[in-house]
Amino acid sequence: MSPSRPGFSCSWLPYLLVLPQLAITAIFFLWPAGEALWYSVQTLDPFGLSSEFVGLSNFIQLFQDEYYLASFYTTLIFSALVAGIGLNVSLFLAAMVDYVLRGSRLYQTLLILPYAVAPAVAAVLWIFLFDPGLGLITHALAKLGYSWNHAQNSGQAMFLVVLASVWKQISYNFLFFLAALQSIPKSLVEAAAIDGAGPVRRFFNLVLPLISPVSFFLLVVNLVYAFFDTFPVIDAATGGGPVQATTTLIYKIYREGFAGLDLSSSAAQSVILMLLVIGLTVIQFRFVERKVRY
């Protein structure tokens, strides 16, 4: 006699339970995405009161705009730097804390603190340190013979926003990496050491494959963070300058949509950014996930 399968007394109850989540998805994702897609094929006046269907004209104009193509390239470079540097530094810090026996709680607390700081505040903090006239780091660099002014030097401006963005995200990555490292059975590491594997070999051949699911998850999260959540950092630190050197796609959407009131162009840029993020996510799940060991 097989046990009875548990179920709901009312056939409509499962749909009622998922209704709030479906409503949130429809209101905050599907509806805005649909409106952006519709506006991207229209020409709207600055107040959105009149429109004219223009098809793919907005997209064609974007890819003929050298400033938009430059922001596209800037976004790719910026995202790769933020995700790559952030993940590697966070993993290194988590590995160091995992090996520390005394005072590990203190190290964990200090490394988690930046996560409580708002992105705009993090940007202001680094601006104070790198201020051309009053910054402590600027004065230290001047004594070494290096002149710093991120308001005039595009490379320095990019360095500043990458540094602030990475510093803000390190705490989030650190928490996941540390939890993954501490979940590895010590017996496996000890067995590898007994077999003659050194610390470096144990880390790359044993530890790194075991935490690959967490690494893959953080890779996706950090790319999304670099594409979207770094907007306050860029806005507070450089305002997209100098000469649009730090203008990413999300910041260009804001500048043209909210500051320039070019709703059609900003909608088309939003659609392109959405497709870009979806494409990168699909590529990661299609190819990168193959190397993940669950």
UniProtKB/Swiss-Prot annotation:
SUPFAM superfamilies: MetI-like (SSF161098)
Transmembrane segments: 12-32, 81-101, 110-130, 158-178, 208-228, 263-283
Entry-linked InterPro entries: MetI-like, MetI-like_sf, UgpAE/MalFG_permease
Subunit and interaction comment: The complex is composed of two ATP-binding proteins (UgpC), two transmembrane proteins (UgpA and UgpE) and a solute-binding protein (UgpB).
Periplasmic compartment spans: 33-80, 131-157, 229-262
GO terms (BP aspect): transmembrane transport
Pfam families on file: BPD_transp_1 (PF00528)
Cytoplasmic side: 1-11, 102-109, 179-207, 284-294
Domain of life: Bacteria
Protein name stated in the entry: sn-glycerol-3-phosphate transport system permease protein UgpA
Predominant localisation class: membrane
Function: Part of the ABC transporter complex UgpBAEC involved in sn-glycerol-3-phosphate (G3P) import. Probably responsible for the translocation of the substrate across the membrane.
Keywords: Cell inner membrane, Cell membrane, Membrane, Transmembrane, Transmembrane helix, Transport
Family of this protein: Belongs to the binding-protein-dependent transport system permease family. UgpAE subfamily.
Domain ABC transmembrane type-1 positions: 72-284
Localization per Swiss-Prot or TrEMBL: Cell inner membrane
Membrane topology reported for the UniProt record: Multi-pass membrane protein
GO CC, any one term: plasma membrane
